[in-house]
């Protein structure tokens, strides 16, 4: 009788330990890695984009040092994406697309959560400052040539 109780008690403990192990395993399986969370955010950005081509992760800054391992708390991210040759309407995953030669580059910053269920992210992407400055300068030069070009040509003809 005593051995039956001990055996039954051991069986219950084993069952509880097994259940606890399953719960912990499923909880840890739901947490994404930092890189996986960023890739998911890039996919969401591509879905919401109105641009012609997909963007793909080019470079990911290292994750910040944080003591908090809670996957529901937003983590700061910083990364760069580059335009690919794949049209946005294609069903091909961006990670399988080649980068477009001279494709547009964007710097992205924001937050992601590592919770696999959630898909929570807040990301803003923009062209790097130097590229924007060069484009702006190019537009100003083109505008100046358009506006003052004929006058400059007349002066050159008169002087020459």
UniProtKB/Swiss-Prot annotation:
GO terms for molecular function: lipopolysaccharide binding. Pfam families: Cathelicidins. Transmembrane segments: none annotated. One of its GO terms (biological process) is antimicrobial humoral immune response mediated by antimicrobial peptide. GO terms for cellular component: extracellular space. Residues 30-131 form a propeptide. Disulfide bonds join 86-97, 108-125. Residues 1-29 form the signal peptide. It comes from the Eukaryota. It is found in: Secreted. Its main location: secreted. Keywords: Antibiotic, Antimicrobial, Disulfide bond, Secreted, Signal. Thermostable. PANTHER family: CATHELICIDIN, CATHELICIDIN ANTIMICROBIAL PEPTIDE. Belongs to the cathelicidin family. Broad spectrum bactericidal agent. This is Cathelin-related peptide SC5.
């Amino acid at each position: 009788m005593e051995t039956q109780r001990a055996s039954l008690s051991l069986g219950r403990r084993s069952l509880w330990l097994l259940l606890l192990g399953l719960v912990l395993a499923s909880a840890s399986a739901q947490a994404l890695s930092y890189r996986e969370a960023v890739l998911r955010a890039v996919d969401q950005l591509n879905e919401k984009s109105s641009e012609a081509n997909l963007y793909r992760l080019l470079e990911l800054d290292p994750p910040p040092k944080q003591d908090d391992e809670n996957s529901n708390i937003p983590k700061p991210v910083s990364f760069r994406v580059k335009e690919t040759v794949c049209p946005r309407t294609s069903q091909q995953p961006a990670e399988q697309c080649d980068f477009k030669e001279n494709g547009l580059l964007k710097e992205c910053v924001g937050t992601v959560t590592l919770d696999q269920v959630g898909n929570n992210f807040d990301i803003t992407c923009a062209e790097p400052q130097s590229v924007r400055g060069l484009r702006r300068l190019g537009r100003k030069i083109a505008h100046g040539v358009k506006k003052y070009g004929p006058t400059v040509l007349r002066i050159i003809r008169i002087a020459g």
